[in-house]
Amino acid sequence: NKRAYDSIGECMRKKIIIIMTAIVLFGGFIAGYRNINQKYPARKVETAEKGESLEFLDGVKISASGVKWLSTEEQAAIYENSGIDTSKVNYDTKIIEVNVCLKNTTEEEKEVPITYLSLETTGVGTAISRELLMGNSEHYSSMVEKLEPGEEKVVTYPYEICSIWFHKKDWKNIEMRSFWMTFASYPDKIVLYL
């Protein structure tokens, strides 16, 4: 009888220790989670519709002014000029050209690095295609744009979209998807809708 009582008591002590340990671990998890959220708060999203401008760099405004999906023939010419042999690629691609307007609002010359501009859609993001840019420099703008005081300039950049990034059904309707430009993601995400 005493053994059974000791066995029950031992079992209860183990359960109490396990429950207390779980409570302490859970409390530590919650405290850590709150600490991380205070150090790294949720990002704010600043958006602009097509034609609206946002501050890109100090004194430089940017706005999306146009989008063009290249035809198969136009795309083939761009790849050929870039020296890219697409016959060895086992997936489809599309090239989207994005026009952005840069405006220097200062009284001094500005050099604007464009490498920050990314093209995004739900679940996928891509940078300016340097290979296409360099191989077609007469058609596309530079990776660093120079702007005189008060100058406004429309520049064009190519972005390559690959079928392997999407489900087949999504790829069939790729040109119908919503795309946007971003140039900052944290602490503030800045979005230019196309």
What are these regions (language model features)?
Residues 1-11:
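Short, Lys/Arg-enriched N-terminal segments with co-localized hydrophobic residues
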